[in-house]
Amino acid sequence: MKKEFNVHKTLVVPDEANLFFVGDIHGCNDLLEDALKLAGYNSKKDCVVCVGDLIDRGTQNLQVLAKFLYNPRFISVRGNHDQFMIVGDWANWMYNGGMWAMNELDADTIKNIAEDMAEKMPVFLTVRHRGKKFGVVHGGVPFTYKECGNEVETPVWDNLIAQVEAAKEDPHDHPGYHIEPYLWDRDVIQEIGFYLSKNGEEHPYFQRYAGFKEKYMVEVPEVKGVDFVFHGHTGVPYPLLYKNRVYLDTGGVFNGQLTVAQVNDETGKITTFTTDKIDSCGVQRILQ
C-alpha cells in the first residue's frame, strides 16, 4: 500500500513532558512560536501535536514543515492541504495556496518532502499521555447511520481506524476514498452550530445555522474510546468543545488567532491559549 494512504500511528508521550495540541498552522511559524510561548511550552521536553494543514496560505511553510517532519517533539496528522502535496493533486493544491512550493522549490525537492510527509503524517493519530487517550484527525469524525431509519451510530475510535485500515486493502476500491471524509468533514460541526444557535449562542458565526429545520436535526454523539478527539479544518470563532470533540482552527493565517490547547491532568478540562494581533498576552479559556 502506498505511503500516501498511511492511516494510523500511536504516540506515547512521556509523563515528564507536557502535551500541547495546536490548530491549523498554514505556514505561520512565527504565530506558532507565539502561541506556544503563551501556553508555557518548554522546547527541551514538551510535545506538540497539530491537527493538520501545516502548509499553504502562510509564508513560512518550510519552517513549519521542518519542525513537524524532523523534530521528534512535533507531530501532525495530515490535513486536506497536506494531502494535496502528498498525492500531487496539483490543480486543487495550486488553487488553494500551494503556489509557494512552485516559487520556492524544484520538482525533486517537492517530491522528497511529500514522501516524508506521507511517511510521518498519518490520517489518524492516537496519543497516550499520563493515563489519558486522545484522538486526532483533521476534518472530524463523520456521521454514520444505522441500517434502519436516520439514527446516528455512536463512533468508537479504534473501530474507525480498523475499518479504514481494512477498507484500504480492497483491491477494487480507490484507497484514498475511505480517508477523504476524515480530512474534509464539515457535517458534524454544522450540526453543532445548529444546536448552539438554538440554545442561545448569539455569535454571528453560529446564527448562520439558525435556519436549519429542527425536525432534521441530528444529535451529535461523543466519540467512544478516547477522552477527547481534536480537529481542525473548519474555522470557528473560538476554541470549541462539544461532547468530547474539540475544534481548534480559529483562523490563525487569516486573523492572527492561532490556538494551542492543553488538557489539565487534575480536572480533565481543556485550557486553550489563543494569540491576538492587538494583545500580546492573547486569550486564555477553559472549555466547558
Where on the chain are the PLM-derived regions?
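Active-site neighborhood of phospho(di)ester-bond hydrolases with catalytic His/Asp-centered motifs
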Residues: V22-G23, V48-G52, S76-N80, V137, ...
